[in-house]
C-alpha cells in the first residue's frame, strides 16, 4: 500500500510541478552500530517559501533538534539529517519531503543500512587460572553476521598443535584441560566475517597461578637456653605468584609488624624467623605458612630447647659427732634431665665402688657410711654415724650433654677436741725446740699446757714459752738441765668435751756411724756405697764426712757431703787418688747435736793408670728448636789427665758429621743448625795418654719446624746475636748507673753509698742495728772450720716479756744448735800432688732440728 501511494504522489508532483528537484547526499548509507552519520537534503527549483521535512522509516515526521536523530534546516534549499550512535533499530528508508508555497511536493529517499561491526563484548585480560584445573578462556564476539573464531598461541593456531588438551567450545571459548605453567602466555582470539572481509582480534593474557609449596630446612632444631644464643628457623617456599609467608607458635600467630619486638626477627620475605636470647619458653612447634591466590601450604618445625644444668637448691647442715645420720640435698634443673654427682675436696663419692645399687637410684659405699639417692632432678647424700672428719665442703655437680653446674654446701660437725702431734721430741741442753700439739675441735677449744700438774708457763719454768694458732699450740722449750726433759701435757677443752695428750721431751744424741757396703775404686777416684746410720740421734742427718788416707800415712784427708744428695743414691765419691795405691776410707754422720761415731775403715786399692771412663752426657735443647747443648760431666780420668774429648754426631740413617775435638777443660758442646724433627745420636769419647774411653751415647730429637718465619726486613737482621746482646748489656749498665746516682743523692743508698761508707768512713743509714735470724745454724768460712750457732739472747726476747706480740713459729722455728766440734779436718799429706782443696761446708737452717718421727732409729 505504501509503495502505491508514494507512486501516485510522485506522478502527481511530476505532472504538476516539474520545476522542483530534491536530492539526498549521500544517496545511500551504511552505518556501523554505534557510529554517527549525517545526510544532506538539497532542493533545486524556482519555488519560494519551500518547507523541507524529514520522515523516519516508520513514516513519522522527525522533529528538529532531537537528541540522537537530529534534523537541522540549513537554509531555504537544504536540510540535514544526523543520526548519532546508530543502533540496529535506526535502519530503514528516510525520506526528505519538500513542499512548495502552492502546495506542490517533491521528495527524495535514502536507504540507511545499519550493521553490527565485529566486536569483542566479553574478553577480559588477563585471565588467571590455577595450575592443574580445566581452564576456559572467555572471548564473546558480536557482529551482524555470525563470525568465524580462530584461537592462536605464539603465532600458531592452537588446533594445529594437535594437543588434545586444547578444545574450542561451541560458544567459541577455548578450553585447556589440566592447564600447566608452560601454557601461560598471550592467546589471540581472532574473529572473521567473510562476507565483508572483516577481521578483528583481541590478545588475552593467560596467567597460570601455581599453588605454593613450602618445606622446612630442618624439621627439628635444637638450641640451648640461657646462653644469649639466637636460633633461625628457615622455610623454603615456591609458587606463583610468589607466596607470602607467615608464622605461628603453637597455633598462635607471630606478628611481623611489631617494631619493638626484640624477640622475633623476620627476614625481608619472612622466610626466616630468628628467635633471639633463646630460653626454655621458646620451645614449641612453629608453623610457617606460604599463601598466594592459588592456595596455601604449611610446614612444621619443632624447636627443642635444651638447658644447661642449674643447681636450684642446696642447704648447709649442722650435726654432732656420732649422730645417727645427716642428709644433704641438691636439686637441679636442666634439659635433658641432669644427673647429679657428689664429691668433696679429697674424694669423688659418686665414682667410688658401691656396695649396692637399686632403683629409684640408691648407691651405698662399701663401708656403708654414705648413701646417695637420686630421683629425677633431686639427689641426696646421707652420712651415717657422723665423724668429725665428715665436716667440710660438699660439692654437688649436675651434668647433662649441654654442660654442668656445681654448687657447694657445708656440713658443720661439732665435736670434742682431738689432739695430734709427734709424741717424742728430741733436743739437747741449750737448744730451743717446739713441741707441737695439733688441735681439731669445733667449736674452737681452749688449750693449756701442764708439767707435773702445774700450768705452764710459770715462774718455775722461765725457759718455756707458748705460741697459739687456730689449729695448733706450740710449747717452746730451751732445756737448761736434765730436769727439763720428760713429760709435758697438752689439754684442749670446748663445750662438747676435752682431750689430753702426753708429749715426751727426749735428749737427742749424735748419730751412729754409717756402714760402708762396698767401695768401687778407679784410677783416681773411688765410689763409696754406704747405708744410713741406724740411729740418727733423734734429729735429721745434715752431712756426711768421708775420711781417707793411703796405707802408711798418718794423717787423714776429709771432705763433707750434703746428706740429701748423698742419701739419694747412697754413694759418695772420693777424688784426687793415686793409681795403684791402697787406701783406707771411713765415714761419719753429722746432725744438729754434732758429729757422730766414725765407721770402721774399709780398705781398697785404686786401679792402675788406664784409659779414662766415658763422660756422662746430659742434653739441653735450645730455644730455637734445632740446636742442643750437650753437657760433658767428667768421670774418672784413669789416673792420667784427659787430653781432649772427641765428639761425633749424626741424624739417624744419615752420614756422620765431621768429628769435633774439644779441649780437656770443656764441659759442653753446642750442636747447631740441625735438621728439623729429626732424631740424632751423639757419641763422646775421652782420651788420655793411655788411650780412649768407651763412647758415651746420647739420643735426642729436634723440634718440628715452626710455621711462622720472621720477616727479612727486620731491623736486627743484619746484626749478630752477640752484637744484640752487647747492646742490651750496655743499655742495662747505663740504666743501673743512673738509678744508683739517683738513689745516692735522694735516699743515701746504693752502690755509691756503699763505697762511701766502706772507703770514706761515712756512716750508713742502716748502721743503728743488725739482723740476726733466730735459731739459724751455719758454718763459718774462716780457717777454724768450726760450727757456729747463732742463738737468741735474753735481750732479743725482751719485747715478748714486755707484752709484745709473739712471732708465730713454723716448721723451721726454733732451730737447733749443734755441739761444738770439728766440722772438717785436713792433714798435710806427704805428696804435694795429693793435696786436696779446702772445702767450705754450710748447714741448711731448717734441717738443724726436727722431731723424731721414727722412734726405732733412736
Curated annotation (Swiss-Prot):
Stretches assigned to the Fibronectin type-III domain: 510-609, 611-706
Ranges for region Disordered: 765-858
GO process annotations (BP): animal organ regeneration; axonal fasciculation; behavioral response to ethanol; calcium-independent cell-cell adhesion via plasma membrane cell-adhesion molecules; calcium-mediated signaling; cell adhesion; cell surface receptor signaling pathway; cellular response to ethanol
Disulphide bridges: 41-96, 139-189, 235-288, 330-396, 437-490
Family annotation (CDD domains): FN3, Ig, IgI_1_NCAM-1, IgI_3_NCAM-1, IgI_NCAM-1
GO CC entries: axon; cell surface; cell-cell junction; cytoplasm; external side of plasma membrane; glutamatergic synapse; growth cone; neuron projection
Transmembrane residue ranges: 722-739
Record's keyword terms, sorted: Cell adhesion, Cell membrane, Disulfide bond, Glycoprotein, Heparin-binding, Immunoglobulin domain, Membrane, Phosphoprotein, Repeat, Signal, Transmembrane, Transmembrane helix
Record-linked SMART domains: FN3, IG, IGc2
Top-level taxon of origin: Eukaryota
GO MF, one annotated term: heparin binding
Extracellular-side segments: 20-721
InterPro entries: FN3_dom (IPR003961), FN3_sf (IPR036116), Ig-like_dom (IPR007110), Ig-like_dom_sf (IPR036179), Ig-like_fold (IPR013783), Ig_I-set (IPR013098), Ig_sub (IPR003599), Ig_sub2 (IPR003598)
Glycosites: 222, 316, 348, 434, 460, 489
Annotated Pfam families: fn3, I-set, Ig_3
Binding site for heparin: 152-156, 161-165
Protein name: Neural cell adhesion molecule 1
Organism: Rattus norvegicus (Rat)
The organism's taxonomic lineage, starting at the top: Eukaryota, Metazoa, Chordata, Craniata, Vertebrata
Amino acid at each position: 500500500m505504501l509503495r502505491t501511494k508514494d507512486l501516485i504522489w510522485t506522478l502527481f508532483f511530476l505532472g504538476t510541478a516539474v520545476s522542483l528537484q530534491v536530492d539526498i547526499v549521500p544517496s545511500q548509507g551504511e552505518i556501523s552500530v554505534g557510529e554517527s552519520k549525517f545526510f544532506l537534503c538539497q532542493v533545486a527549483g524556482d519555488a519560494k517559501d519551500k518547507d523541507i521535512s524529514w520522515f523516519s522509516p516508520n513514516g513519522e515526521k522527525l522533529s528538529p533538534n532531537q537528541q540522537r536523530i537530529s534534523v537541522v534546516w540549513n537554509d531555504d534549499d537544504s536540510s540535514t539529517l544526523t543520526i548519532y550512535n546508530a543502533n540496529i533499530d535506526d535502519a530503514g528508508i528516510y525520506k526528505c519531503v519538500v513542499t512548495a508555497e502552492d502546495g506542490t511536493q517533491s521528495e527524495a529517499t535514502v536507504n540507511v543500512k545499519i550493521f553490527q561491526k565485529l566486536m569483542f563484548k566479553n574478553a577480559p585480560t588477563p585471565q588467571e587460572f590455577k595450575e592443574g584445573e580445566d581452564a576456559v578462556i572467555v572471548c564473546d564476539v558480536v557482529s551482524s553476521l555470525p563470525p568465524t573464531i580462530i584461537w592462536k598461541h605464539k603465532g600458531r593456531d592452537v588446533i594445529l598443535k594437535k594437543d588434545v588438551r586444547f578444545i574450542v567450545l561451541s560458544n567459541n571459548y577455548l578450553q585447556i584441560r589440566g592447564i600447566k605453567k608452560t601454557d601461560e602466555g598471550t592467546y589471540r582470539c581472532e574473529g572473521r566475517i567473510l562476507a565483508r572481509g572483516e577481521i578483528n582480534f583481541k590478545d588475552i593474557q593467560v596467567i597460570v597461578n601455581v599453588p605454593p609449596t613450602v618445606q622446612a630446612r630442618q624439621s627439628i632444631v635444637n638450641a640451648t637456653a640461657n646462653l644469649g644464643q639466637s636460633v633461625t628457623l628457615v622455610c623454603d617456599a615456591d609458587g606463583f605468584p610468589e607466596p607470602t609467608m607467615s608464622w605461628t607458635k603453637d597455633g598462635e600467630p607471630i606478628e611481623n609488624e611489631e617494631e619493638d619486638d626484640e624477640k622475633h626477627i623476620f627476614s625481608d620475605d619472612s622466610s626466616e624467623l630468628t628467635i633471639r636470647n633463646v630460653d626454655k619458653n621458646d620451645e614449641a612447634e612453629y608453623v610457617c605458612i606460604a599463601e598466594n591466590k592459588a592456595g596455601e601450604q604449611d610446614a612444621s618445625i619443632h624447636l627443642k630447647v635444651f638447658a644447661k644444668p642449674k643447681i636450684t637448691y642446696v642447704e648447709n647442715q649442722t650435726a654432732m659427732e656420732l649422730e645417727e645420720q645427716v642428709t644433704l640435698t641438691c636439686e637441679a634443673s636442666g634439659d635433658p634431665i641432669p644427673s647429679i654427682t657428689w664429691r668433696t675436696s679429697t674424694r669423688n663419692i659418686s665414682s667410688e665402688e658401691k656396695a649396692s645399687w637399686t632403683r629409684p637410684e640408691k648407691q651405698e659405699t662399701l663401708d656403708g657410711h654414705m648413701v646417695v639417692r637420686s630421683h629425677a632432678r633431686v639427689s641426696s647424700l646421707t652420712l651415717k654415724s657422723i665423724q668429725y672428719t665428715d665436716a667440710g665442703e660438699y660439692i654437688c655437680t649436675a651434668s647433662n650433654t649441654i654442660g654442668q653446674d656445681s654448687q657447694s654446701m657445708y656440713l658443720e660437725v661439732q665435736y670434742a677436741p682431738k689432739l695430734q702431734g709427734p709424741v717424742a721430741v728430741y733436743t739437747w741442753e741449750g737448744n730451743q725446740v717446739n713441741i707441737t700439739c695439733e688441735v681439731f675441735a669445733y667449736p674452737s677449744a681452749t688449750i693449756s699446757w701442764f708439767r707435773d700438774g702445774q700450768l705452764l708457763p710459770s715462774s718455775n719454768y722461765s725457759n718455756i714459752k707458748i705460741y697459739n694458732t687456730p689449729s695448733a699450740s706450740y710449747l717452746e722449750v730451751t732445756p737448761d738441765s736434765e730436769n727439763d726433759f720428760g713429760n709435758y701435757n697438752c689439754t684442749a677443752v670446748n663445750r662438747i668435751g676435752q682431750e689430753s695428750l702426753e708429749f715426751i721431751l727426749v735428749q737427742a744424741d749424735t748419730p751412729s756411724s754409717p756402714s760402708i757396703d762396698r767401695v768401687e775404686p778407679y784410677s783416681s777416684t773411688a765410689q763409696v756405697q754406704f747405708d744410713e746410720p741406724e740411729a740418727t740421734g733423734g734429729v735429721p742427718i745434715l752431712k756426711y764426712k768421708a775420711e781417707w788416707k793411703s796405707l802408711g800415712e798418718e794423717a787423714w784427708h776429709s771432705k763433707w757431703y750434703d746428706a740429701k744428695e748423698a742419701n739419694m743414691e747412697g754413694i759418695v765419691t772420693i777424688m784426687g787418688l793415686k793409681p795403684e795405691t791402697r787406701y783406707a776410707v771411713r765415714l761419719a754422720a753429722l746432725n744438729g747435736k754434732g758429729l757422730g761415731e766414725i765407721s770402721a775403715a774399709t780398705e781398697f786399692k785404686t786401679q792402675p793408670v788406664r784409659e779414662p771412663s766415658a763422660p756422662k752426657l746430659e742434653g739441653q735443647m735450645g730455644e730455637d728448636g734445632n740446636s742442643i747443648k750437650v753437657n760433658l760431666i767428667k768421670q774418672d780420668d784413669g789416673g792420667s789427665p784427659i787430653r781432649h774429648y772427641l765428639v761425633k754426631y749424626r741424624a739417624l740413617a744419615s752420614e756422620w758429621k765431621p768429628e769435633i775435638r774439644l779441649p780437656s777443660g770443656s764441659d759442653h758442646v753446642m750442636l747447631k743448625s740441625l735438621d728439623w724433627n729429626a732424631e740424632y745420636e751423639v757419641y763422646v769419647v775421652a782420651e788420655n795418654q793411655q788411650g780412649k774411653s768407651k763412647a758415651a751415647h746420647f739420643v735426642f730429637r729436634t723440634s718440628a719446624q715452626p710455621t711462622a718465619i720472621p720477616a727479612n726486613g727486620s731491623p736486627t737482621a743484619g746484626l749478630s746475636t752477640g752484637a744484640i746482646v752487647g747492646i742490651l748489656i750496655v743499655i742495662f749498665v747505663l740504666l743501673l748507673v743512673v738509678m744508683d746516682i739517683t738513689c745516692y743523692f735522694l735516699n743515701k743508698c746504693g752502690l755509691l753509698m756503699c763505697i762511701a761508707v766502706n772507703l770514706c768512713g761515712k756512716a750508713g743509714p742502716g748502721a743503728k742495728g743488725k739482723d740476726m735470724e733466730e735459731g739459724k745454724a751455719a758454718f763459718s768460712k774462716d780457717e777454724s772450720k768450726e760450727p757456729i750457732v747463732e742463738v737468741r739472747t735474753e735481750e732479743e726476747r725482751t719485747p715478748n716479756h714486755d707484752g709484745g706480740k709473739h712471732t708465730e713459729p713454723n716448721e723451721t722455728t726454733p732451730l737447733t744448735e749443734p755441739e761444738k766440734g770439728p766440722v772438717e779436718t785436713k792433714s798435710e799429706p806427704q805428696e804435694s800432688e795429693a793435696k786436696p782443696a779446702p772445702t767450705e761446708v754450710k748447714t741448711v737452717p731448717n734441717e738443724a732440728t726436727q722431731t723424731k718421727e721414727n722412734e726405732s732409729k733412736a
